[in-house]
């Protein structure tokens, strides 16, 4: 996940990471502390204050969604190449790419080299975003021609919804919120569970806990 720095930050401890306003940071772990994230910049990693950055949620990043839930969601998509990136269940801190092809969903481990670059095969990238963009026109598979395509959205649905009730996550990959919170809907292709962003976090939430709002927030 990527974030953009809103302010300059000067590290005051050995395990903190300095950055300048406008820097793009790779957020490695959002769960270390309520107020601090672990992030990487220019090959160095350390802790950064949460309130100094703005997350850049991508519609294809689903966080800690379980592999089975990813397969269920992608199997409902109509076109080959529909994909999402999730945090690996078997290797915490790593990422997996799940892609629909035919009647199956294929999973690819996103690898990283010693310099922190991401890759699937040979070509390496500075960010997951660059990897995704490259594989929109270059197959992710060596056995079939599979080009990444965004999950189909339903544009008639609202961009924002408001929480009717408190929701506390029961599983990894779910999005917690309080009654009255506004949630940015990032994917509503599943009738029961939608993906959204709230308070800088992204995750899945139950559709029946929210109501549409007729304005942007």
UniProtKB/Swiss-Prot annotation:
Keywords annotated in UniProt: Acetylation, Cytoplasm, Endosome, Golgi apparatus, Isopeptide bond, Nucleus, Phosphoprotein, Repeat, SH2 domain, SH3 domain, Ubl conjugation
Entry GO CC: cell cortex; cell-cell junction; centrosome; COP9 signalosome; cytoplasm; cytosol; endosome; Golgi apparatus
Consequence of gene loss (knockout): In a conditional knockout mouse model, Grb2 deletion induces a rapid decline of myeloid progenitors (CMP), myeloid/erythroid progenitors (MEP) and granulocyte/macrophage progenitors (GMP) and a progressive decline of long-term-HSC and intermediate-term-HSC numbers.
One Pfam family named in its UniProt record: SH3_1
GO MF annotations, alphabetized: ephrin receptor binding; epidermal growth factor receptor binding; guanyl-nucleotide exchange factor adaptor activity; identical protein binding; insulin receptor substrate binding; molecular adaptor activity; neurotrophin TRKA receptor binding; phosphotyrosine residue binding
Tissue-specificity statement: Expressed in macrophages.
Signal sequence interval, chain numbering: none
Residue numbers of N-acetylmethionine PTMs: 1
Record-listed N6-acetyllysine modification sites: 6, 50, 109
Location(s), subcellular: Nucleus; Cytoplasm; Endosome; Golgi apparatus
Phosphothreonine sites (modified residues): 211
Modified residues (Phosphotyrosine): 209
Domain-level remarks: The SH3 domains mediate interaction with RALGPS1 and SHB.
Function: Non-enzymatic adapter protein that plays a pivotal role in precisely regulated signaling cascades from cell surface receptors to cellular responses, including signaling transduction and gene expression. Thus, participates in many biological processes including regulation of innate and adaptive immunity, autophagy, DNA repair or necroptosis. Controls signaling complexes at the T-cell antigen receptor to facilitate the activation, differentiation, and function of T-cells.
Subunit structure: Associates (via SH2 domain) with activated EGF and PDGF receptors (tyrosine phosphorylated). Interacts with PDGFRA (tyrosine phosphorylated); the interaction may be indirect. Interacts with IRS4 (when Tyr-phosphorylated). Also associates to other cellular Tyr-phosphorylated proteins such as SIT1, IRS1, IRS2, SHC and LNK; probably via the concerted action of both its SH2 and SH3 domains. It also seems to interact with RAS in the signaling pathway leading to DNA synthesis. Interacts with SOS1.
Family: Belongs to the GRB2/sem-5/DRK family.
Entry protein name: Growth factor receptor-bound protein 2
Species of provenance: Mus musculus
């Amino acid at each position: 996940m990527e974030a953009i720095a809103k302010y300059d930050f000067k590290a005051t401890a050995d395990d903190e990471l300095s950055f300048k306003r406008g820097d793009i940071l790779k957020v490695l772990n959002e769960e270390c502390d309520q107020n601090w994230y672990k992030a990487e910049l220019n090959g160095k990693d350390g802790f950064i204050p949460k309130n100094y950055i703005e997350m850049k949620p991508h519609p294809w990043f689903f966080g800690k969604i379980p592999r089975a839930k990813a397969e269920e969601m992608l199997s409902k998509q109509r076109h080959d190449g529909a994909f999402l990136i999730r945090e690996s269940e078997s290797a915490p801190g790593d990422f997996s790419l799940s892609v629909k092809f035919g009647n199956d969903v294929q999973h690819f481990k996103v690898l990283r080299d010693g310099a922190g670059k991401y890759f699937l095969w040979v070509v390496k990238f500075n960010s997951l975003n660059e990897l995704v963009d490259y594989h929109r026109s270059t197959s992710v598979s060596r056995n079939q021609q599979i080009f990444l395509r965004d999950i189909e959205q339903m544009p008639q649905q609202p961009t924002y919804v408001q929480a009717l009730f408190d929701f506390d996550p029961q599983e990894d990959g779910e999005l917690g919120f309080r009654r009255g919170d506004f949630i940015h809907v990032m994917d509503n292709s599943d009738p029961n569970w939608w993906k959204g962003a709230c308070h800088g976090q992204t995750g899945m939430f139950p559709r029946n806990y929210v109501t549409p709002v007729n304005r942007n927030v």
